[in-house]
Amino acid sequence: MELKNKKILVVGLAKTGVAVARFLAKAGAFVTVTDMREEEALADVLAELSDLDITYELGRHVPYSFLMADLIVVSPGVPMDIKPLEMARSQKRRVVSEVELASWFIKAPMVAITGTNGKTTTTTLTGEIFKACGFETFVGGNIGNPLIELAESGQEVARVVVELSSFQLEGVESFRPDVAVLLNITEDHLDRYHSFQEYIDAKLRIFENQTADDFAVLNIDDPLVAACASKLKAQLFPMSRLHELEEGISYRDGFITFSHKGKVLRFGTEGFKLKGVHNLDNIMASLASTLLMRCDGDCAYEAVKSFKGLPHRMELVEEIDGVAYYEDSKGTNVGSVVKSLESFDSGITLIAGGKDKGGSYEPLAPLVESRVSHLVLIGEAKARMQQALGSLTDTHEAQTLEEAVEIARRLTKPGGVVLFSPACSSFDMFKNYEERAERFKAAVRAGKKGEA
């Protein structure tokens, strides 16, 4: 689509909206930005765009602007079913996401990665493998830099790796990755979607425009993911920790085996720095994606062995008096916490809770009963979590994260583990999951110094 002199409305002025507005203005479009927040709340953001010719409609959405736009670009934080967007679609206005817009201007081969959990680790590792194998690579999307920033820069890269949330996938039309990865599907964002199926359908849009020339990497150990296989137009490339595969990538007895069209590569996992059962899935997805896109096996293996993982994902903070403290603030849904609990056999003190996302906590029940010695609950969700899990183990409530850490310190015996994996978002008590993580680390370290 030619952007020059087109009337384009950008809905939402967070990080992605800023990047989109900047790109469109520089491309010569007539840009209007609308956001329900008032000007005072957006002062810093507006300063970033002050040198560009942009019209702002703040504190409200003006229906006329939605109806007159040649194109509407919606930021991921804005639900697609708000009334102005529904009205615009009913009048045949074109409504897309930032990822869709960016894809029109990016020609490099692309790996796109989605799933409820593990996206960021898999995306980062995939990018690291490409770079180690000599491919200049852009890594972005839901992690770090919006994809539109690559389009704006004009930088020529050999590979693109993009992490995609369900929100970003809602607004795709022609977006088509060469390799699309679906890691897993568990209940999440039910505070945004009307049903679990609606959330699943958003995830599956990653495959919508693929053809037989493309690959779909599916974790077939997840029944909801495996059920998608029959709907694919792309070539299925399965991954599994539970089954050996003649075609695909699988794990057995300490080795990952990649098999594709008669080519077989085996990778021993003993030297991997990235620990945890769930990370085997992330590693297999990263290896599959990069090896399918012409990375050298030895080079890819060395990159995996040197990868230490990311902050806020099962990060060992300290070992104090024989107790290991793990920070897993990115564990914002039940499925993620299940994976984290599976990494330990027993003796866990679990700190959980935060802003409730509307899903069921029942999938945690078997692991809480069998592996969690003490459960400490915080935040808005603690009443619901108490009801679902409180009778299964020794359970306590705390008013602050610092109090929760102190309770955990008192209860956990040497040789045990304190795991902070909330199963909830952070917005009831913190600005974001990063701030929540730093508060946990500070509380743990304060105890080490005898300050708590």
Curated annotation (Swiss-Prot):
It catalyses: UDP-N-acetyl-alpha-D-muramoyl-L-alanine + D-glutamate + ATP = UDP-N-acetyl-alpha-D-muramoyl-L-alanyl-D-glutamate + ADP + phosphate + H(+). Its main location: cytoplasm. Its EC number is 6.3.2.9. It is found in: Cytoplasm. One of its GO terms (biological process) is cell division. Pathway: Cell wall biogenesis; peptidoglycan biosynthesis. PANTHER family: UDP-N-ACETYLMURAMOYLALANINE--D-GLUTAMATE LIGASE. NCBIfam families: murD (TIGR01087). Cell wall formation. Catalyzes the addition of glutamate to the nucleotide precursor UDP-N-acetylmuramoyl-L-alanine (UMA). This is UDP-N-acetylmuramoylalanine--D-glutamate ligase. It comes from Geobacter sp. (strain M21). The lineage of its organism: Bacteria, Pseudomonadati, Thermodesulfobacteriota, Desulfuromonadia, Geobacterales.
